[in-house]
């Protein structure tokens, strides 16, 4: 299970790095694009390794694998803060965001995503749901960020 846990974490970290490495002026134009490509990649990976990924998501309590979503949330929170600093640098500072609300929203996003795997949605449906999730979460974050 370790290799599957690590793949998901590393793929997500890579997407965060790709976005952070973009020129700051370009980041608002593509906000969400890289991370949602990453979500599709993680979805396909999880479906290719369904049993192992479901074990991580559903049966890993008490093991080192139980923190997958929490670790991803921490990475996303850090990325969100970095993006807020970029927006401020560009003269488009976002309004303050309550840290508890931020944590709840990000945690909810990952739980929503991984529900597709847990419930073994047919892959074409899951792909469509990820597209819908992208529209929903991107619009919400744009509103919260005052963009």
Predicted regions located by residue number:
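Amphipathic alpha-helical packing segments from all-alpha helical-bundle domains
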Residues: 33, 37-48, 63-89, 100-107
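Amphipathic alpha-helical segments used for helix-helix packing
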Residues: 15-20, 24-26, 45-63
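C-terminal/domain-terminus segments
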Residues: 56-73, 125-141
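Alpha-helical structural segments
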Residues: 1-21, 37-41, 67, 71-74, ...
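Solvent-exposed, amphipathic alpha-helical segments
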Residues: 7, 11-18, 52, 108, ...
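Short, flexible, glycine-rich and Lys/Arg-enriched loop motifs at helix boundaries
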Residues: 10-35, 83-93
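Hydrophobic/aromatic-rich alpha-helical bundle segments in the mid-to-C-terminal region
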Residues: 83-136, 145
């Amino acid at each position: 299970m370790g290799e599957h846990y690590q793949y998901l974490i590393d793929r997500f970290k890579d997407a965060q790095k790709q976005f952070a490495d973009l020129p700051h002026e370009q980041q608002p134009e593509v906000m969400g694009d890289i991370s949602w490509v990453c979500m599709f990649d993680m979805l396909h990976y999880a479906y290719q390794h369904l049993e192992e990924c479901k074990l991580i998501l559903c049966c890993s309590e008490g093991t080192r694998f139980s923190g997958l979503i929490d670790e991803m949330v921490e990475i996303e929170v850090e990325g969100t803060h970095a993006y807020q600093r970029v927006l401020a640098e560009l003269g488009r500072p976002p309004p303050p965001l309550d840290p508890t609300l931020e944590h709840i929203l990000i945690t909810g996003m990952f739980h929503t995503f991984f529900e597709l795997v847990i419930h073994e949605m047919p892959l074409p449906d899951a792909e469509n749901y990820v597209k819908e999730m992208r529209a929903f979460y991107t619009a919400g974050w744009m509103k919260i960020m005052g963009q």
